[in-house]
Amino acid sequence: MIIALTGGIGSGKSYVCKLLAERGISVYDCDAHAKELMRTSQSLQQQLSTLIGDDVFRDGVLQKSILAAYLLRSEDHVQAVNAIIHPAVAHDFEQSGQTWLESAILFDSGFDKRTHIDKVVCVTAPEDIRIHRVMVRDGISRDKTLEWIARQLPQEEVLRRSDYEIINDSIRPLAPQVDHLLSVISE
């Protein structure tokens, strides 16, 4: 069974992945693998340089600020970058043999259609908590955080398309929710 973990920026997906790891479950981090593939794949580097400009890589190192600025300019830019990166990540996941994956933009990117997924788990959190988490974690302004949140599908839509929910509202403990999820999935 292939299980995808998703949720908006700042929802706490990484913490849920940590709890899963503590329970012996390795989760394929789509974002981390996308970054690794951009670092190691000459083909991806060439395609992105052609699309964005040669300055997106300096001595083979991705210039995140240039990529981010390009992505924030338009939805067409996001789709063009996704069309290059996501097929490579989907192929890499399929080759990995892992049964869990984590992707913040599972539905936004169409990644759920690029590879077989049996069940989807959505990590949710109130927007004010998400905003605070991202501002602290990334050291960015509230406006920039809201810009990134607006680039993703609304949390309600992601939840509607998911099979399970883990609520990360700083009130309900996460570990019991993860344990319950694992027991339900294993039935």
Place the predicted regions along the sequence by residue.
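Walker A/P-loop
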Residues: 14
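Hydrophobic anchor at the beta1->P-loop junction of P-loop NTPases
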Residues: 3-5
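ATP-dependent small-molecule kinase phosphotransfer cores
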Residues: 32-99
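ATP-dependent NMP and nucleoside kinases share a basic, alpha-helical "lid"
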Residues: 92-94, 101-133
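P-loop (Walker A) phosphate-binding loop of NTP-binding proteins
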Residues: 8, 20
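Small-molecule kinase domains that catalyze NTP-dependent phosphoryl transfer to phosphate-bearing small molecules
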Residues: 89-93, 113, 136, 140-184
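ATP-binding Walker
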Residues: 11
